[in-house]
């Protein structure tokens, strides 16, 4: 089995359906004997340029190890699902399990906000 990185963008009005979509896609990978190495839901993000007059989309990143049949099935599913605006499937040489730069930046912002809150609370006392 080969390793793949999959990113898909979902219509912002369909954001509530994303958890079900993720469950369905990861289920099909696992049923075929594949593995999910990394799964990140980046949430709604601003697009670099409008797609179908939309300026935001819900992003999901998956790193999987799966047979080619599953990848072909996912491609077909993405193609015929109107909620998926764009998708990309890239074959990688090895499994990627570390957090993506998007998640690292988000965690750093969260940590710095907590430090600022603690400093503010200390200043009040």
Curated annotation (Swiss-Prot):
Molecular functions per Gene Ontology = small ribosomal subunit rRNA binding; structural constituent of ribosome
Per the record, the coiled-coil ranges are: none
Claim: Transferase is one of the keywords in the record: no
The reply on keyword Mitochondrion is: no
What CDD domains does UniProt report for this protein, alphabetically?
A: bS6 (cd00473)
Disulphide-bonded residues = none
Task: Quote the protein name from its UniProt record.
Answer: Small ribosomal subunit protein bS6
Q: Which organism does this record belong to? A: Mannheimia succiniciproducens (strain KCTC 0769BP / MBEL55E)
Species lineage, top-down?
Answer: Bacteria, Pseudomonadati, Pseudomonadota, Gammaproteobacteria, Pasteurellales
Task: Identify the gene encoding this protein.
Answer: rpsF
């Amino acid at each position: 089995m080969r390793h793949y990185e999959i990113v898909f963008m979902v219509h912002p009005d369909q954001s509530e359906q994303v958890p079900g979509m993720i469950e369905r896609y990861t289920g099909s990978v696992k049923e075929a004997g594949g593995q999910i190495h990394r799964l990140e839901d980046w949430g709604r993000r601003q697009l670099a340029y409008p797609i179908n007059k939309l300026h935001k989309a819900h992003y999901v990143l998956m790193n999987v190890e799966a047979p080619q049949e599953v990848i072909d099935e996912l491609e077909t599913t993405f193609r015929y699902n109107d909620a998926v605006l764009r998708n990309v499937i890239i074959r990688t040489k090895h499994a990627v399990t570390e957090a993506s730069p998007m998640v690292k930046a988000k965690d750093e912002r969260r940590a710095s906000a907590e430090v600022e809150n603690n400093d503010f609370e200390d200043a009040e006392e």
